[in-house]
A protein has these predicted regions:
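Nucleotide-sugar-dependent
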Residues: 314-315, 383, 430-436, 441-466, ...
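Conserved N-terminal segment of class I S-adenosyl-L-methionine
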Residues: 1-84, 88, 102-105, 175-195, ...
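S-adenosyl-L-methionine-dependent methyltransferase catalytic module, highlighting the catalytic core
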Residues: 4-5, 9-10, 35, 77, ...
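A charged, aromatic-enriched C-terminal amphipathic alpha-helix characteristic of glycosyltransferases
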Residues: 360, 509-547
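Donor nucleotide-sugar binding/catalytic pocket of nucleotide-sugar-dependent glycosyltransferases
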Residues: 70-71, 175, 330-362
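N-terminal pre-catalytic "stem/leader" segment of glycosyltransferase-like enzymes
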Residues: 221-285
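Conserved acidic donor-binding segment of nucleotide-sugar-dependent glycosyltransferases
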Residues: 484-495, 503-508
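Conserved catalytic-core segment of nucleotide-activated headgroup transferases in glycan assembly
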Residues: 232-254, 359-360, 368-439
Length: 569
């Protein structure tokens, strides 16, 4: 007989992203074994995490993940938390276990800061499985789940909305958790005649009965609203995740912000009545139809931002089209100060958001002191690594099975490695890329000294360091980030590379020391939690200055003020 996992050992994946990523103080009521605290530490280790848990054994298990944990019954008394001090108050599967959840909501709402948010996950008493079991005569309590024998209270969507309002809060949004879509479809199909006989519209009933739970967000005052829609490139090498998906998810963790990512270059349907921003990911805007496209985007009323994180000289058509890619938008966002200086030639409104990670993973390397694996997984780096291959092969010959190599995407480099201790994987998803990297101890990051490379960011170092890899890198780009001998090694020539690699093989503890230092640096300064507020502040400032920015746009490109002939797609 297997022992069931401790209550609360896993974080609710639908609740976690609805907590503001840059929250400074969070109270987790009924934290159980601390799953939410553990997961949150990987997203924002700088948050002050406070928990309430009445069960002594669970509290002891959760304690390492929180700054404070109070062993008390939330219905018997409030935790020692100052009124107005919390950015987030979390009830994850807790309210249904309380005798008087309405009183608890009223009592704890005062702990929220003026812009703080209550996040709660509650079961839906209208879930179709309730009706199904009652109709079939099989309703009984269970140890866990919707029919948990410790559930004392039940909520409908309308009932929970009323409870939040009566607690003095403003319901902001609610997300349904649907775990068995085929089940509700089959159930509604079977009982549709009865529903219709009762005057209940089957589709409406299905919407109410499908969610197993609801995740609610409510605030003390109505938040300012903002809609951000991004039009993206075809996913390649994780750039979409790092530059678009994860930053927008960070924005959407704030109440009142709606974020959506759509592939391609069509005209997005912006939510009505909400100030909007359209982000174009690296669109060249060189086609003859580009002015019409930009006019159609402008006609939505949204502010237009170009997201560009590479040297535009790599695409000559940008210059040939008069740099419309940057002149024809309200603002530009990029990843490095060098790129900002370049884009300022064509647009005075440029912001830098360094590449950062949404979460820092738990390390799973350095498990064998007798073997190290070198990771090489960047795109279009064949010319950068080629001069180093003879030196790498020499070290591989000396090291034997003590050194393996993991190569992603670059088949030519893989084939040139003279060792049986090598693995190859084609270009896959960003998750697959990270999984391959996570099993290695050393990352090799070569970059030739070219204009295009000098404009690149240090993302590969950030990703590798987060997984606790020791980086050996070129001075181009990485010399400004890596402290040689402290957070990695900087090498310029093949013989320097071979010397550094031999030293790490001789003393793996040194590789681990530098990898740990690099990981600590990423945790301190290169997580999205550190820049979420700055990005949102810039976006809101653009909205406030839209008239001014729009006038500047039309002064740069007067043709964008003409009537559009573009057909929205």
């Amino acid at each position: 007989m297997t022992t069931p996992p401790a209550y609360g050992i896993r974080a609710n994946p639908d609740l976690l992203p609805r907590i503001p990523l840059d929250a400074r103080a969070i109270l987790d009521v009924g934290c159980g074994a601390g799953g939410l605290g553990a997961a949150w530490r990987r997203r924002n280790p700088h948050t002050r995490l406070i928990a309430v848990e009445p069960d002594a054994a669970l509290a002891a298990e959760a304690e390492p993940h929180y700054d404070e944990i109070h062993r008390l019954d939330i219905e018997a008394g409030s935790p020692p938390v100052a009124e107005g001090s919390l950015d987030a108050l979390v009830f994850g599967d807790v309210l249904e276990h309380l005798r008087d959840p309405w009183a608890v909501l009223r009592g704890t709402a005062r702990l929220l800061a003026p812009d703080g948010v209550l996040v709660a996950c509650v079961p839906n008493v209208e879930h179709w499985s309730f009706a199904a079991r009652l109709l079939m005569g099989g309703w009984r309590y269970e140890e866990t789940g919707l029919f948990d024998r410790t559930h004392l209270r039940w909520f409908t969507r309308d009932g929970m909305h009323q409870a939040l309002v009566e607690a003095g809060l403003v319901p902001v949004d609610v997300a349904p958790r649907i775990v068995d879509a085929p089940g509700i479809e089959d159930f509604v199909r079977r009982i549709s005649p009865a529903l219709q006989a009762l005057g209940v519209e089957p589709a409406g009933y299905a919407r109410r009965a499908a969610p197993l739970q609801y995740v609610w967000r409510a605030t003390r005052r109505r938040p300012a609203r903002l809609a951000v829609v991004a039009r993206t490139l075809r996913p390649v090498g994780g750039i979409n995740e790092v530059r678009i998906h994860e930053p927008l998810a960070a924005l959407a963790s704030r109440p009142g912000v709606v974020a959506r990512v759509e592939p391609g270059a069509g005209i997005p349907q912006m939510p009505p009545g909400i100030p909007g921003i359209i982000v174009l990911q690296r669109q060249l805007l060189n086609a003859p139809s580009a002015p019409d496209y930009l006019r159609a985007l402008r006609a939505t009323g949204a502010l237009i931002i170009q997201e560009f994180d590479d040297d535009p000289a790599h695409w000559p058509v940008i210059e040939e089209s008069g740099h419309l890619a940057f002149r024809g938008v309200h603002a530009v966002q990029t990843s490095t100060p060098a790129l900002r200086e370049l884009f300022l030639r064509w647009n005075p409104e440029v912001a830098v958001f360094p590449n950062a990670l949404a979460t820092v993973p738990e390390p799973r390397n350095f498990t064998s002191p007798d073997r190290l694996t070198l990771f090489f997984g960047a795109l279009n780096r064949e010319g950068d690594i080629a001069p180093f291959l003879p030196a790498l092969n020499a070290v591989l010959a000396e090291a034997g099975e003590r050194l393996a190599v993991q190569v992603l995407h670059d088949r030519a480099t893989f084939d040139a490695l003279e060792t049986p201790h090598k693995r190859f994987a084609p270009l896959g998803s960003y998750a697959e890329y990270q999984a391959a990297m996570a099993g290695c101890e050393i990352a090799f990051l070569p970059l030739r000294d070219t204009r295009f490379n000098r404009m690149k960011s240090d993302l590969k170092f950030v990703e590798a360091a987060a997984h606790r890899l020791c980086c050996i890198a070129s001075p181009v780009v990485y010399g400004a980030t890596i402290r040689d001998g402290e957070t990695g090694r900087i090498v310029q020539a093949p013989d320097e590379f071979a010397h550094a690699l031999r030293a790490l093989l001789a003393t793996p503890a040194e590789a681990l020391r530098m990898a740990e230092a690099a990981r600590a640096e990423v945790i301190a300064s290169r997580l999205l939690a550190r820049q979420a507020a700055a990005r949102l502040s810039w976006y809101r400032s653009l909205i406030e200055r839209r008239a001014e920015l729009d006038a500047a746009l039309l002064a740069r490109v007067p043709v964008l003020g003409a009537a559009t002939t573009h057909t929205p797609r």
